[in-house]
Amino acid sequence: METNDLGFVATLLFVLVPAIFLIILYIQTNSREG
């Protein structure tokens, strides 16, 4: 299985973007309650 740079970046973005979005939501809800 060859590692493609574009595929690697796409996979990285596909994983990181929702994770960052959830972290931002989590921080916002915590700051509102606190």
Curated annotation (Swiss-Prot):
InterPro entries (UniProt xref): PSII_PsbM, PSII_PsbM_sf
- Entry keyword Thylakoid: yes
* Compartment(s) of residence: Cellular thylakoid membrane
Q: Keyword check for Glycoprotein, yes or no.
A: no
Q: Topologically, how does it sit relative to the membrane?
A: Single-pass membrane protein
Q: List the disulfide bonds.
A: none
Q: Which Gene Ontology cellular-component terms appear in the entry?
A: photosystem II; plasma membrane-derived thylakoid membrane
Protein name as it appears in the record: Photosystem II reaction center protein M
* Taxonomic source organism: Synechococcus sp. (strain RCC307)
